[in-house]
Amino acid sequence: MKFESLASSSTGNVYIVSDRDTRILLECGVSHKRLKELTGFSLSEFDACLVSHEHKDHSGCAAKLIADGTRVYMSQGTALALGLE
C-alpha cells in the first residue's frame, strides 16, 4: 500500500492511497484542473474519493468528481452542507 500527500494546507488537501489494484483519493480540496495536474492521472482512473468534511480545502471539487462519475463518499451532513443531497 502506498500513501502520497499531494497537497496539504489551508489552500487545499489531496492524498492518494493505492495498491496494485485500487487508487483512492482522500480529500479533493483543489480545483478539478489542479487535481488532474497534481495526480498525473485521468480522474476516471480513481476508484473512489473520500471527503472528510465540507470545508472547501477538503471538498473543493467533490461535485465535479461526482458529475464525472467518480464515487465520492462523505457523511450525510457533509453532503447536505455541500448541497449534494
What does each model-identified segment do?
Residues 1-39:
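Conserved beta-strand hairpin/beta-sheet module of binuclear metal-dependent hydrolase folds
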Residues 31-78:
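Active-site metal-binding motif and surrounding structural segment of the metallo-beta-lactamase
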Residues 80-82:
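A short, active-site helix/loop in glycosyltransferases that binds the activated sugar's phosphate group
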Residues 85:
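Short, conserved SAM-binding/catalytic segment
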